[in-house]
Structure formats: structure tokens, C-alpha cells
Amino acid sequence: MGKVHGSLARAGKVKNQTPKVPKLDKKKRLTGRAKKRQLYNRRFSDNGGRKKGPNSKA
């Protein structure tokens, strides 16, 4: 067995000192087919993936 650097009494000291920050709620990311569709629209369409209205000049 290898030698231990320092006392095991201090194990986890920094993690225990760090304040707990709760996770933020985020919108779920698209997966699968929907993600590929979003990528296609982002790369190849001129309006950022949004549908054009009947009166748009885009």
C-alpha cells in the first residue's frame, strides 16, 4: 500500500468548506430528430429556423 500525504483527518476539508449553491432550473435541450432539425435550420435557413409569416419580407 502507498504512503499517505498528510493526515486523513483533513480529508474533504475544501469540499466541506465550499458553500452549497442550488442548481438552476434550465429549459430541456432538444434531442434526436428535433435537435438535427434545429441545427439544420440554424445553419442553412436565412431566418434562424422560424417560419415565415404570409406578409414577411424575409
Swiss-Prot record:
Organism, scientific name: Plasmodium falciparum (isolate 3D7)
GO terms for MF: structural constituent of ribosome
InterPro entries on file: Ribosomal_eS30 (IPR006846)
Cellular compartments annotated: Cytoplasm
Keywords assigned by UniProt, alphabetized: Cytoplasm, Ribonucleoprotein, Ribosomal protein
Function: Component of the ribosome, a large ribonucleoprotein complex responsible for the synthesis of proteins in the cell. The small ribosomal subunit (SSU) binds messenger RNAs (mRNAs) and translates the encoded message by selecting cognate aminoacyl-transfer RNA (tRNA) molecules. The large subunit (LSU) contains the ribosomal catalytic site termed the peptidyl transferase center (PTC), which catalyzes the formation of peptide bonds, thereby polymerizing the amino acids delivered by tRNAs into a polypeptide chain.
PANTHER family listed in its UniProt record: 40S RIBOSOMAL PROTEIN S30/UBIQUITIN-LIKE PROTEIN FUBI, RIBOSOMAL PROTEIN S30, ISOFORM A
Taxonomic classification: Eukaryota, Sar, Alveolata, Apicomplexa, Aconoidasida
Comp. bias (Basic residues): 25-40
Protein name in UniProt: Small ribosomal subunit protein eS30
Residues covered by region (Disordered): 1-58
Assembly with partners or alone: Component of the small ribosomal subunit. Mature ribosomes consist of a small (40S) and a large (60S) subunit. The 40S subunit contains about 32 different proteins and 1 molecule of RNA (18S). The 60S subunit contains about 42 different proteins and 3 molecules of RNA (28S, 5.8S and 5S).
Gene Ontology cellular-component terms listed: cytosolic small ribosomal subunit
Record-stated family: Belongs to the eukaryotic ribosomal protein eS30 family.
One GO biological process term: translation
Gene: RPS30
A Pfam cross-reference name: Ribosomal_S30
